[in-house]
């Protein structure tokens, strides 16, 4: 639409210029001549008057057309939005996604006022950039528009000096010449030769200076090298034609501004300036000063300010302590900070001081950040959260500046709470290496230490931080006075998982009460963190929707657990009959060996459906959460793990690579027993745990001790495999029956195994997780209350055993 407008405007101006420089003006000049000449040229004047009337009539009609075109063009809403610097109005998406509640107007006004005061300087940069972007394209369009008038309209024709002399000057068609900017000669021609025209009188201004000639029509132009050369050639040409010196073609020198050339002179500067501004705006997202494209509107000069997420009592979608489960002890610790901020007088009367900080420590997914969000929802005081990586930047000095800005904001809003997520990004121990990035991180850490406990600290600001690597933090950061408390958030036990499942199951449409599923699912998911439980509930709902289920059932939850543990089910994977038979006998060996071992975990189901990237089948057990493991328990677990390889050797007669993962687990467990737990008599009561950071370049024992460890591990694994082969030989028929049934059904549950193997010969005196899975907590608690059980002897002072690790040789 814009190009159509410029095209029409160009044609209108071209037509009007023909009138301005043509016969219309000449006729008008004749109207202004002396009365003595009127009679001599009455016919020509009458023709001129008629010509003027016709041109004025056509000009009026063209003006009306141009006005109509302009009105039509600028009435286009797209063009008006294009040239407008106002933000576009939001579309009515609320019709499809209605809001539950409307915010109070007073809150909106207060939030708007607060935001306007905060971003007053930021809006100036946004306004300038928006104005520049809105004007950039129109300026380019105007440049193209003016380029059409750089040397006149499209009716002018460029000629050479030789053509000018032969075709225009010699016939006497040249009225006068205007030399523009000493570079272009504009030729104004007559409609008839000079010897056939009446004499034109040129009036002056009364001072002897003739006025500028207005006769002739501008139709041709040519470039000149220099003024002197042009005048010399023109004089020679007229002299050769025998023209009297008093009748030489008048030459006028004019200075004109060609907008196109002027614009092109400044175009490189404007282009460079626009590129720099555009690049700076695009870099705002990468500089940590806003989202992509500068969403938060902070310029590069405000890069020293921290990107803070604020929450207060007016915030939406709050999380409360009732929404957090599975970490009651940690929740009690963190609630004391909230109570102190709400009612400090109660503690001050007793002489107590609020701890300055608390460090939330725990594995990933246990709810550290969720607990911090609940603290923000319950406290009712300003809550400022930031990530540890937000302090680090490509510019030197940005980290300390952001730390100062963060604590300055917190002190202005005191009492307040600061939460730094993943503080290990800046809190690593100092003194390791001296590179530039390390120096910048150390400067940030030093500034954080000073702000938390230094000369300029003030009361009323509590600092919370979360990390899953407390071992690498600097000792100065962990001392009392900075982080007074370390709150450990472990993976939930079976009771904690039950509480977490109840929270997430409330949002799902079930065929039973949430408590019915929570008790059983908690028994099926040992070692799951809160994030894993949330994933299981979501996967179960997705599976139910995929199968067009009206409600979510236990089968959907079991499929979701299999999905989380084993990976995606791949029924379409092409497996040969021999491979499928090998997998069936392998999994059958695991099931039978574990069934007849006292300390093995109860089997829940076994399947030969491929899952994930490598698993062609697996057996699922319901393990108990034991804090201590005996040598006999670990030996039975080793035998159960080797059951698949033993079944392949005894029943098929050939072994395969399917036991690779089993052998890896066996090696890890056996090395841990010999080199970590001190179970070997030859090695003695020594423990060589591997380093957690992975920098295990040297062994903490001699080569002789390493050889003893290797020999002892081989002997233990050989004994376990010998016992496993004996069990498979003893129950060979049952192993084959289960394998053939697996080939038929692909999935076998414990009820199917009971029909072939019968009841397990061993019965635990205590309630196991499998019992809780079958009947739920409430019934098992009644049974355990009626049946006296032997209390296990637990040494409260003994630390839990290490996770089995591999000691490389």
UniProtKB/Swiss-Prot annotation:
Its EC number is 3.4.24.-. GO terms for biological process: proteolysis. Its main location: mitochondrion. GO terms for cellular component: chloroplast thylakoid membrane; mitochondrial inner membrane; mitochondrion. Zn(2+) binds at residues 586, 590, 662. Its cofactor is Zn(2+). Residues 93-122, 776-809 are annotated as: Disordered. Induction: By heat and high light. InterPro entries: AAA+_ATPase, AAA_lid_3, ATP-dep_Zn_Metalloprotease, ATPase_AAA_core, ATPase_AAA_CS, FtsH, P-loop_NTPase, Pept_M41_FtsH_extracell. Residues 1-83 form a transit peptide. The keyword Protease applies. GO terms for molecular function: ATP binding; ATP hydrolysis activity; ATP-dependent peptidase activity; metalloendopeptidase activity; zinc ion binding. It comes from the Eukaryota. Residues 93-121 have a biased composition (Basic and acidic residues). Binds 1 zinc ion per subunit. Keywords: ATP-binding, Hydrolase, Membrane, Metal-binding, Metalloprotease, Mitochondrion, Mitochondrion inner membrane, Nucleotide-binding, Protease, Transit peptide, Transmembrane, Transmembrane helix, Zinc. The keyword Transmembrane helix applies. The chain crosses the membrane at residues 132-152. It holds the Pfam family AAA_lid_3. It is an enzyme of class 3 (hydrolase). SUPFAM superfamilies: FtsH protease domain-like (SSF140990), P-loop containing nucleoside triphosphate hydrolases (SSF52540). The active site is at 587. In the N-terminal section; belongs to the AAA ATPase family. In the C-terminal section; belongs to the peptidase M41 family. Probable ATP-dependent zinc metallopeptidase. Involved in the assembly and/or stability of the complexes I and V of the mitochondrial oxidative phosphorylation system. This is ATP-dependent zinc metalloprotease FTSH 3, mitochondrial. It comes from Arabidopsis thaliana (Mouse-ear cress).
């Amino acid at each position: 639409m814009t190009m159509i407008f410029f095209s029409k405007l160009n044609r209108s101006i071209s037509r009007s210029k023909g009138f301005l420089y043509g016969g219309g003006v000449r006729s008008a000049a004749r109207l202004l001549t002396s009365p003595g000449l009127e009679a001599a040229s009455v016919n020509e004047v009458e023709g001129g008057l008629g010509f003027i009337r016709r041109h004025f009539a056509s000009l009026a009609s063209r003006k009306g057309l141009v006005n109509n075109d302009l009105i039509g063009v600028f009435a286009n809403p797209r063009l008006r939005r294009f040239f407008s610097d106002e933000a576009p109005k939001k579309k009515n998406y609320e019709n499809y996604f209605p809001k539950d509640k409307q915010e109070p107007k007073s809150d909106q006004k207060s939030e708007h006022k607060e935001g306007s005061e905060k971003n007053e300087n930021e809006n100036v940069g946004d306004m300038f950039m928006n104005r520049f972007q809105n004007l950039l394209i129109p300026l380019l369009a105007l440049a193209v528009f003016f380029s059409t008038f750089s040397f006149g309209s499209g009716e002018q024709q460029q000629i050479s000096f030789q053509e000018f002399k032969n075709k225009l000057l010699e016939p006497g068609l040249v009225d006068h010449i205007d030399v523009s900017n000493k570079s272009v000669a504009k030729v104004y021609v007559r409609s008839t030769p000079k010897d056939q025209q009446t004499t034109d009188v040129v009036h002056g201004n009364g001072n002897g200076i003739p006025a500028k000639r207005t006769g002739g029509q501008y139709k041709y132009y040519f470039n000149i090298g220099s003024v002197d050369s042009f005048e010399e050639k023109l004089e020679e040409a007229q002299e050769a034609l025998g023209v009297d010196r008093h009748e030489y073609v008048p030459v006028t020198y004019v200075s004109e501004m060609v907008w196109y050339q002027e614009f092109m002179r400044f175009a490189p500067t404007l282009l460079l300036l626009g590129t720099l501004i555009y690049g700076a705006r695009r870099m705002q997202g990468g500089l940590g000063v806003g989202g992509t494209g500068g969403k938060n509107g902070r310029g590069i000069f405000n890069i020293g300010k921290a990107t803070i997420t604020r929450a207060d009592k007016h915030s939406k979608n709050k999380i409360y302590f009732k929404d957090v489960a599975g970490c009651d002890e940690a929740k009690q610790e963190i609630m004391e900070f909230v109570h102190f901020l709400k009612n400090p007088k109660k503690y001050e009367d007793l002489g107590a001081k609020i701890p300055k900080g608390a460090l939330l420590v725990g594995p990933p997914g246990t709810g550290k950040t969720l607990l911090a969000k609940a603290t923000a929802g319950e406290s009712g005081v300003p809550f400022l959260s930031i990530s540890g990586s937000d302090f680090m930047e490509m510019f030197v000095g940005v980290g300390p500046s952001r730390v100062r800005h963060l604590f300055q904001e917190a002190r202005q809003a005191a009492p307040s709470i600061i939460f730094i997520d993943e503080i290990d990004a800046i809190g690593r121990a100092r003194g390791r290496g001296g590179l530039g990035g390390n120096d910048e991180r150390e400067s940030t850490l030093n500034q954080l230490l000073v702000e938390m406990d230094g000369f300029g600290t003030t009361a009323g600001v509590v600092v919370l931080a979360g990390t899953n690597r407390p071992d690498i933090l600097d000792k100065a950061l962990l001392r009392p006075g900075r982080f007074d408390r370390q709150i450990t958030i472990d993976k939930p036990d079976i009771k904690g998982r039950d509480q977490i499942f109840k929270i997430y199951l409330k949002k799902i449409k079930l065929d039973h009460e949430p408590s019915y599923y929570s008790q059983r699912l908690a028994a099926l998911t040992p070692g799951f963190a809160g994030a894993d439980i949330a994933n299981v509930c979501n996967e179960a709902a997705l599976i139910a929707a995929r199968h067009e289920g009206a409600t979510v059932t236990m089968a959907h939850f079991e499929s979701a657990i299999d999905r989380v543990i084993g990976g995606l089910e791949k029924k379409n994977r092409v497996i040969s009959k021999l491979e499928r038979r090998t997998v069936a006998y392998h999994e059958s060996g695991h099931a039978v060996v574990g069934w007849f071992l006292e300390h093995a975990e109860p089997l829940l189901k076994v399947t030969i459906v491929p899952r994930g990237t490598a698993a062609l089948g697996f057996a699922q057990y319901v393990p108990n959460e034991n804090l201590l493991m005996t040598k006999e328990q670990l030996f039975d677990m080793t035998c159960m793990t080797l059951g698949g390889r033993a079944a392949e050797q005894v029943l098929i007669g050939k072994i395969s690579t399917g036991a690779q993962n089993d052998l890896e687990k066996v090696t890890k467990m056996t090395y841990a027993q010999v080199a970590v737990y001190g179970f070997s008599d030859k090695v003695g009561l020594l423990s060589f745990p591997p380093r957690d950071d992975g920098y295990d370049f040297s062994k903490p024992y001699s080569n002789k001790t390493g050889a003893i460890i290797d020999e002892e591990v081989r002997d233990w694994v050989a004994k376990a495999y010998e016992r496993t082969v004996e069990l498979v030989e003893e129950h060979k028929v049952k192993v084959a029956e289960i394998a053939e049934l697996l080939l038929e059904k692909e999935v076998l549950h414990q009820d199917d195994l009971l029909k072939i193997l019968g009841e397990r010969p061993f019965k635990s005196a205590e309630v196991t997780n499998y019992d809780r899975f079958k009947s739920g907590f409430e019934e098992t608690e009644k049974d355990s209350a009626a049946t006296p059980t032997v209390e296990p002897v637990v040494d409260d002072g003994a630390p839990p055993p290490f996770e089995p690790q591999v000691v490389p040789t």
